[in-house]
Amino acid sequence: MDIAGLIPGASKGKGLGNRFLDDARQADALIHIVDAAGSTDTEGRPVIPGIGDPLFDVQFVEEELDQWLASILERDWNKLVREADNQKMKLEHTIASRLSGLSIKETDIAHTIAELGLSRARANGWSENDILRFCKKLRDRSKPIIIAANKADLHSAQLNIHKIRDTRKNVVPCSSELEVMLRRAAKKKKIEYLPGDSRFRINDTAIMNEQQKQALQKASAFLNKYGSTGVQEIINRTIFNLLRFIVVYPVEDELKLTDRKGNALPDAHLLPVNSTPRDLAEKIHAELGKGFLYAIDARSKMRLGADYKLKNNDVIKIVSATSSSR
């Protein structure tokens, strides 16, 4: 989902801060698109390229999210700790209840407490700094951020990309402008190009003016330098690296790898790592999951049980009592 922009002070309601934070609470990961060329200021206003500071943008977004989480817990921290003590509940369970609706798992809370060496038994002694440290680490674990260093095709972006990479590990240089240009050229049959490709081919019949030729030369140089425009790469890295999803292909015919209409590999489902054939069946349809009997690995033709751990790019036939297969 696309969410509202953020400016300093969002955790206190400045600008569209409340809307941003409401959107962000639903997210499992965040792609932070920054102007790597430094051609906008902190409030998104155009400036001369190189004047803006994208590293500041990266830092303040993280800080606003951390402050927002901390404000939720600090509001009545002592009461929260007493509730955990009085009801004999684990501290992480009580915190998870307070943060309900934020897509934060209780296990992530428990791991964060342990990693920071914070005391569960003496949680009422946590300082404001302890709570902020906890929220920072929890946010990093439960809502990881990947940086899309956009406008990387501009000269002023190079130094800024190095600066961001010196302090952040998940950074992808990209050019949304070049990606749009390549997609439009492909749509008009001037080139052959698929999102994420490291190169494109100019069609023999393509008629282009000098400006279009220069634009393609610029795109080619960018692809040679970075391997892609970065747009598809950042989506792939978010899904497969940060969120650790796998892609699985359900089929009706495990021999021809088709659905009942004869379409080859018609569907692809994203599932969390360690998902099972039953999980896949339930995602396709609740009734299919209820009647799940077994699955078949289309490659090996082996029968798979309900608890088998699916692997990335598995092609699976589901056999169910409620429907012969999917």
Show the residue positions of the predicted features.
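C-terminal-of-GTPase-core extension/linker across diverse P-loop GTPases
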Residues: 77-314, 321-324
